[in-house]
């Protein structure tokens, strides 16, 4: 393990082509339980997302209005883990249909960076429900990134189970999205998702690019390295 851990500490691995795409249906329940309610000020796209206080008018109509935001949508923080250049931000509207509106935001910066621009998404958004998890191109990009880091990647990532996807969703919300490596490390220790799901989550996030103590990275790979094939 000593031969590749130092490389992780010194090397900034480009992750812009690796995207992790769990089904929308696995994300919404987790987000609803962990993220505070937010709203977007209309008119000025440069303004940051703010937390909406209890009972505050969010500018999208009364409760039940199809334009209204989810009570607890995903907080926009730039490049969200696993979203890449795809649409990010708000996951739906309040009501029985849970449809995603046209005014969701799209991140146009590379995967893993901390800054971004925002613009309205005019194209239709994918419907909720099971989705293809990885395209051939994404699998190839993920395999290349793993090989660059010294691992022999699996030939396909389509073998992930629904439980593994749910594990990744939970880990993203609890650790990576908050940018706290200690929280992520504790979550990994408790939930113990499969090594392949854990590694893919980490590569698809900005976790390894953010400042992290060496002890965190060592413990992190202690959890997943025993079951990983090496090239």
Curated annotation (Swiss-Prot):
Entry superkingdom: Eukaryota
Secretion signal span: 1-25
Keyword Transmembrane: yes
Keywords: Membrane, Signal, Transmembrane, Transmembrane helix
Topology of the protein relative to the lipid bilayer: Single-pass type I membrane protein
Chief site of localization: membrane
Annotated segments matching region Disordered: 39-64
Residue numbers on the Cytoplasmic membrane side: 226-231
Keyword set includes Transmembrane helix: yes
Protein name as it appears in the record: Putative uncharacterized protein FLJ37218
């Amino acid at each position: 393990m000593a031969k590749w851990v130092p490389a992780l500490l010194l090397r900034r691995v480009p992750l812009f082509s690796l995207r992790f795409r769990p089904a929308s249906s696995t994300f919404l329940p987790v987000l609803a339980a962990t993220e505070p309610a937010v709203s977007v000020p209309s008119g000025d796209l440069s303004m940051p997302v703010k937390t909406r206080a209890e009972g505050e008018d969010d500018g999208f109509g009364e409760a039940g209005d199809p334009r209204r935001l989810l009570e607890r949508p995903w907080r926009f923080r730039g490049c969200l883990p696993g979203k890449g250049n795809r649409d990010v931000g708000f996951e739906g509207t309040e009501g029985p249909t849970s449809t995603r509106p046209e005014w969701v935001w799209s991140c146009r910066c590379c995967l893993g960076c901390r800054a971004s621009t925002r613009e309205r998404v005019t194209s239709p958004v994918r419907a909720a429900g099971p989705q293809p998890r990885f395209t051939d191109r994404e699998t190839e990009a993920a395999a290349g990134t793993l090989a660059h880091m010294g691992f022999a990647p699996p030939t396909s990532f389509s073998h992930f189970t629904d439980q593994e996807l749910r594990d990744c969703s939970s880990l993203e919300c609890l650790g990576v999205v908050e940018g706290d490596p200690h929280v992520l490390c504790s979550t990994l220790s408790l939930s113990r998702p499969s090594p392949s799901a854990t590694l893919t989550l980490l590569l698809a996030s900005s976790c390894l690019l953010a400042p992290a103590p060496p002890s965190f990275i060592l413990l992190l790979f202690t959890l997943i390295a025993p079951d990983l094939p090496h090239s």
